[in-house]
Amino acid sequence: MFTHVKPTVRHIAPDDLKGRALINVVYVVLEPQYQSALSAAVRSINANNPNVAVEISGYLLEELRSPENYEAFQKDVAKANIFIASLIFIEELAEKVVEAVQPHRDRLDAAIVFPSMPQVMRLNKLGSFSMAQLGQSKSAIASFMKKRKENSGSSFQDAMLKLLRTLPKVLKYLPVEKAQDARNFMLSFQYWLGGSSENLENFLLMLVDKYGDVHAPDGSAIGYQDPVTYPDMGIWHPLAPAMFEDVKEYLNWHQSRPDIGDDLKDPLAPCVGLVLQR
């Protein structure tokens, strides 16, 4: 997949810092599905958060084949506070990502890598939680990544959910001081899997709160909300307050709607539905 859009279209910076701390974020992903939600998340922070502003630069993995883009990526990483990557499974491009990020890993406030090749996953760092030894031990995370590589046909969602089930088992074997960082690592997956602009906004604020040197003027923490989770499968309607996990639940809501007439509530009335991958 080669793109004709320059990475600069994903660059967002605040118009006015207004005395706030500036956090630089760089991300590289396989496909552009997160671009809209991430952009909306950053714009919301810059417009509404009184304590922190975000400058973000984004790259699609294939764009790093271009020497010009790769040089820009290296420069952005060199000044970043937070690095995010997802689905880096192309060997030669994975090596380029590692080459650019590894020299700055220890300096970064946080490095979050969602399922990718082991050498990229080793960049993960959240406080005392690290994946630098991934593949060198028989840990649950190492076993997960091995199975993920062997079962490359499984979906991104399935892989995420497997990891979210595995991590709580890992936590009980960690020293107390590492447990909180491991929990934040797990929360990062939940924010990312949720994928909404609200989840991604709170994901960034969580990282800043826990790992950035940023505080409110009164010394309090940067506020954020827990991730909003969604059903693995469900029925979504744009006017409904939430997703429905089964047909009966959806029909109960549909039949009680005050905004439609009885003709549309007729079980034989035409209805159009779309089957979509989450």
Please name every model-derived segment.
Residues 1-278:
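An N-terminal assembly and electron-transfer interface module characteristic of large anaerobic redox
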